[in-house]
Amino acid sequence: MAPLPLCFVTSSKKKLAEFLHAVGDNTIAHVSMDLPELQGDPETVAREKARAASRIYGGPVLVEDVSLCFNAYKGLPGVYVKSFLTAVGPSGLCNMLLPYEDKSAYALCIYAFCDVTVDDKPALFTGRADGRIVPPRGPQTFGWDCIFEPLEGGGKTYAEMEMVEKSAISHRGKALEKVKAFLTNSGVKVPCVK
């Protein structure tokens, strides 16, 4: 049986859109898979998600895990940002920092590549964007984009940017550049990578 092509695993349509924008529309297989929300540091969470997804898919996968880290909270909500967003929304996240002068934060994206048919040691590709938390601005259509103003963003939140502008400076865009370099040089069966 021929090896399976690389599959990007996500249940988020917005993450998928940004991923396909970066690597080329419809060039990599993708599947929606609800993986368990794990606890731990960002690297451990990404590794375990990749292993689990590769076991289910039966071949090479790429998964993404994102953290939003408030410096005033020593890195929280971090990998738990999805749970915080579900509970309190973007405004609630922003309000967590009301008692603090320090509104600085960083966004962290980790892509993990794993193929359990070869080995179970995921390769990690990390991107980070420093910025600050601001009251919601722009469309509230993708997670916490409307409250994160990256230092490189010219005073705009991610939500106020076009995808091309955001991808050039975002945590996800920085991590994806590393993923593209890896895929270009790895020999992994990928139909096409821009």
UniProtKB/Swiss-Prot annotation:
Its EC number is 3.6.1.66. One of its GO terms (molecular function) is nucleotide binding. Binds 1 divalent metal cation per subunit; can use either Mg(2+) or Mn(2+). It catalyses: ITP + H2O = IMP + diphosphate + H(+); dITP + H2O = dIMP + diphosphate + H(+); XTP + H2O = XMP + diphosphate + H(+). Pfam families: Ham1p_like. Keywords: Cytoplasm, Hydrolase, Magnesium, Manganese, Metal-binding, Nucleotide metabolism, Nucleotide-binding. Mg(2+) binds at E37. InterPro entries: ITPase (IPR027502), ITPase-like_fam (IPR029001), RdgB/HAM1 (IPR002637). Its cofactor is Mg(2+); Mn(2+). Its main location: cytoplasm. Pyrophosphatase that hydrolyzes non-canonical purine nucleotides such as inosine triphosphate (ITP), deoxyinosine triphosphate (dITP) or xanthosine 5'-triphosphate (XTP) to their respective monophosphate derivatives. The enzyme does not distinguish between the deoxy- and ribose forms. Probably excludes non-canonical purines from RNA and DNA precursor pools, thus preventing their incorporation into RNA and DNA and avoiding chromosomal lesions. Homodimer. This is Inosine triphosphate pyrophosphatase.
